[in-house]
């Protein structure tokens, strides 16, 4: 019989495995493993087999291995993992699509009863309806102030009742009632907390972004760049025309207010000194615009004066002539 490995030997083996995975994989899901049983974890490993590896361990061991491996390889990006190793967490190394792996992990959540002393991860609401319990069980409902009535020899809950609030500890009465009603209000499984991809770390919500979401955010970014560039006079293809027009207006305003001038400004100054000149120019432009409409109107009138062509009947070629 082979001798049992010592603690130090186990640490060496674990360190070697973690370092090997860090070298092989560039994508890692950091997952929370609270209330996940060994059988459930085994099922998850089997479901991910092929392109993903699940590694659990103590945070201190994982942090130590990551830090030493970053120093050995010179890859400081690995250090971004260390702040994520808090609480009961594990690592899923994968070469697959991160969204698909995350969805596969979520499939293995299982229902769990409300055990005494457990902190509720969600609000627990008992729905109205027939409980199937006989009237002798009404004491459970009375203790919890749940309104009931007896209907056809069984206890019926009249209205929905919020039995446990998220973050509260499950009491003995709540646990007993939920067990009698056959309600397993909680579900547990590996929950993705963070995503590590080639040194970058982001929240798992990013995996749910669609192409439409990205296009919308890109459009918002372009518009923000446009307004920023026009206000700071930074030229780019979308902002350049507006930057130059605004600059021209500013120069023109300076020329009008000072002795400095240039040909375009001289014309504006003349109009400001004698507004009647501007009126004359506007009046001259109006007939020019009307002149284009005059030939069209004449052509229309000429067309109306043309005699209508004679019909076949008027020329003696009726349809039923013999």
UniProtKB/Swiss-Prot annotation:
Instruction: Give the region (Disordered) as residue ranges.
Output: 294-322
The protein's UniProt keywords, in alphabetical order, are:
Phosphoprotein, Ribonucleoprotein, Ribosomal protein
Q: Which Gene3D superfamilies match?
A: 3.30.70.1730, 3.90.105.20
Q: Which InterPro entries match?
A: Ribosomal_protein_uL10, Ribosomal_uL10, Ribosomal_uL10-like_insert, Ribosomal_uL10-like_insert_sf, Ribosomal_uL10-like_sf, uL10_eukaryotes
Taken from the record, one Pfam family name reads Ribosomal_60s
Please give the superkingdom of this protein's source. Eukaryota
Q: How is it modified after translation?
A: Phosphorylated.
Q: Does the keyword Ribosomal protein apply?
A: yes
- UniProt biased composition (Acidic residues): 304-322
According to its record, what are the GO cellular component terms? cytosolic large ribosomal subunit
Q: Could you tell me what this protein does?
A: Ribosomal protein P0 is the functional equivalent of E.coli protein L10.
Q: Which family does it belong to?
A: Belongs to the universal ribosomal protein uL10 family.
What is the recorded name of this protein?
Large ribosomal subunit protein uL10
Q: Which organism is it from?
A: Lupinus luteus
């Amino acid at each position: 019989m082979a001798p049992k490995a010592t603690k130090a030997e186990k640490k060496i083996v674990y360190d070697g495995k973690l370092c090997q995975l860090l070298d092989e994989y560039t994508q890692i899901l950091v997952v929370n493993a609270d209330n996940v049983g060994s059988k459930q974890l085994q099922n998850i490993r089997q479901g991910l087999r092929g392109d993903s590896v699940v590694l659990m361990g103590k945070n201190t061991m994982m942090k130590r291995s990551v830090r030493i491996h970053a120093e050995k390889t010179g890859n400081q990006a690995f250090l971004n993992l260390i702040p994520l190793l808090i609480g009961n967490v594990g690592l899923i190394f994968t070469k697959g699509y991160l969204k698909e792996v995350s969805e596969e992990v979520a499939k293995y959540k299982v229902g769990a009863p409300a055990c005494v002393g457990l902190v509720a991860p969600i609000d627990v609401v008992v729905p109205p309806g027939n409980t199937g319990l006989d009237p002798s069980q009404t004491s459970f409902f009375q203790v919890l102030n749940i309104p009931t009535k007896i209907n056809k020899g069984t206890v019926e809950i009249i209205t929905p009742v919020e039995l446990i609030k998220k973050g509260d500890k499950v009491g003995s009465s709540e646990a007993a009632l939920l067990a009698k009603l056959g309600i397993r209000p909680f579900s547990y499984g590996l929950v993705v907390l963070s995503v590590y991809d080639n040194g970058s770390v982001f929240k798992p919500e990013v995996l749910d972004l669609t192409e439409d979401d990205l296009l919308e955010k890109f459009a918002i970014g372009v518009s923000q760049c446009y307004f920023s560039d026009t206000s700071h006079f930074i030229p780019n293809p979308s902002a350049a025309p507006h930057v130059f027009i605004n600059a021209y207006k500013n120069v023109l305003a300076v020329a009008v207010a000072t002795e400095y001038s240039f040909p375009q400004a001289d014309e504006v100054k003349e109009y400001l000194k004698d507004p009647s000149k501007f009126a004359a120019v506007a009046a001259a432009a109006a007939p020019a615009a009307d002149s284009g409409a005059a030939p069209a109107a004449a052509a229309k009138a000429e067309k109306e004066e043309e005699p209508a062509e004679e019909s076949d009947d008027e020329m003696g070629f009726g349809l039923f002539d013999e």
